[in-house]
Amino acid sequence: CYIQNCPLGGKRAALDLDVRKCLPCGPGGKGRCFGPSICCGDELGCFVGTAEALRCQEENYLPSPCQSGQKPCGSGGRCAAAGICCSPDGCLADPSCHDEAAFSQ
């Protein structure tokens, strides 16, 4: 499950465990899921609501929490690609996400 929308028991347990990276997605598996319909990678940019992001729906059914991206940004989001901040609800342009170390992988 995405850490922001895990069931309470799962989210509480997440504080004690290492949060894993969300499922890989996109061409060649080079992206990471950021939400049920969002797949982003530093070389790919972001796919929102496209075939490349279909695999990201599987994450909703996995019990352990996941989080993609290194650097927090926006309102509960993480840097997903150059200049892009994503949360499970969507993506926005964010100049703080231009640092290469902030990308998804």
UniProtKB/Swiss-Prot annotation:
Glycine amide carried by residues: 9
PANTHER family the record matches: NEUROPHYSIN, OXYTOCIN-NEUROPHYSIN 1
Protein name: Oxytocin-neurophysin 1
GO biological-process terms attached to the record: response to external biotic stimulus; response to food; response to mechanical stimulus
Function: Neurophysin 1 specifically binds oxytocin.
InterPro entries xref list: Neurhyp_horm, Neurhyp_horm_dom_sf, Neurohypophysial_hormone_CS
Lineage of source species: Eukaryota, Metazoa, Chordata, Craniata, Vertebrata
Subcellular location: Secreted
Encoding gene, per UniProt annotation: OXT
Miscellaneous: 'GKR' has been placed at positions 10-12 by homology with the complete sequence of the other precursors.
GO cellular component: extracellular space; secretory granule
Family: Belongs to the vasopressin/oxytocin family.
SMART domains the UniProt entry points to: NH
Quaternary structure annotation from Swiss-Prot or TrEMBL: Interacts with oxytocin receptor (Ki=1.5 nM). Interacts with vasopressin V1aR/AVPR1A (Ki=37 nM), V1bR/AVPR1B (Ki=222 nM), and V2R/AVPR2 receptors (Ki=823 nM).
Organism whose genome encodes this protein: Equus caballus (Horse)
